[in-house]
Amino acid sequence: MNPLAVLMPGFVGYTLPAWLEQRLRDGLGGVCLFAANVESPAQLRALTDAIHAANPLAVVSIDEEGGDVSRLYQAVGSPFPGNAVLGRLDDAAATEAVAARVGAELAAAGVDLTLAPDVDVNADPRNPVIGVRSFGTDPARVARHSAAWVAGVQAQGVSACAKHFPGHGDTAQDSHHALPTVDADAETLHARDLPPFVASLDAGVATVMTSHIMVPALDPELPATFSRPILRGLLRAGLGFEGVIVTDALDMKGASEGRGIPAAAVLALAGGADLLCLGSVNPDEEIGAVADAIAAAVADGSLDGARVADAAERCAALGRAHAERRTAASSAVPEIVGAAEVRGTFDVSDEAAAALAADRPRAWLRLEPAFNVAVGNAPWGPFAAGVDAAATLGPDGDPASFAAAVPAGALAVVVGKDNHRHPWALAAIDAVRGRGDTVVVDMGWPGDVAADVATYGASRLVGDALLELIGH
């Protein structure tokens, strides 16, 4: 038994460090790449080639969702629409085409596994971490598009990952920072949250990612990532999934707060997880500590060695499958939706449409919330598309000064994300509205207030579509 075989750490840098190369030669199961590992397509391919040269069975993964969450385009903003826009467009062929384009780019970069799609049903509009990463609020629609996304990306030889099992959509907390609880009963969970996972499994999804959430109706004692009833019971025995169960990053507080990553790794394996994503920055000493904790747990009987061996074999099987097809040509990639189609999915109030029809200068104002850990600090919306804001306001800014940046006679265009979740943003919007004509744009998941235009995404492509609607 080699504990390294089930570990998938992250690191910082554009080239493979010597210590990580040695871990790969020693049998490390995979490497998870993040924005800190991506400088250019050529550099990324050289990095993945180096990883595979050190261990041909290593699974190279990346968080590329084709929208707000993008590692390939973290520096410039994503050219893809994102799941919420695709759900509103509700054309499964368009969703499959976007996923195929994502898959083709990942295959060219030497990536084996994309940690996508997000198949959560966004049941709570206050959700701080899912939102526009979801295909929507209707389980049947989310299921259709989840299956299409899986089919599209896997047709290019890149494995997909349906996440976050058994459903992270009905939470008002971010599991990067806390341990959320989904209080729904079992009947609701089966009717609302599970259909997209079932559809993904039917589409042949290679992997499923766990969520660091409590679901008392399924397991009152442990988070899903550590839960035998949820992973071995519901996912394996109940739904019949035989692929690789991947954990969400174990450095997230929802998994490791109060126990540490090594203990979280042991619990995840015991629960039924196979490939353990450790996080974005895992130094050699930490990898060693996790491997030692797994070995010690097997030695003292608190972790079944057969369970670790089973997990390692599932990871190796995934690695072998990719090693055999890495040189295969990708399938043809169809055209994907453009700005015009994206613009058609926007919600635009009658008042905003009338204001935008007037021939007058625009003053763009930017509301900049603290960035979501999953999304990262990526360029977004019209600002990724080249718009210069007359003023930018964050949580500690002065709303009056923000409003004063609008020139006389201009139409104020206030652009933010999830405006309804931020009292400081609502105060700023009120201040700008108080000085004159204003159009408020929400590029996140809109609430029932403070949005004249709702775009349901903030990728660079969605920003281009917004520019076409509003003009300069």
Regions found by a protein language model. Give the residues of each.
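Short beta-strand elements of ligand-binding domains
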Residues: 60-64, 115, 438-446
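A charged helix-plus-loop insertion that forms the helical arch/lid used to bind
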Residues: 76-91, 134-136
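Preference for extracellular/luminal or secreted protein segments
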Residues: 1-26, 258-472
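Second-shell residues forming the walls of enzyme active-site clefts
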Residues: 10, 36-56, 60, 68-71, ...
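Catalytic domains of carbohydrate-active enzymes, especially glycoside hydrolases
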Residues: 22-34, 101, 108-113
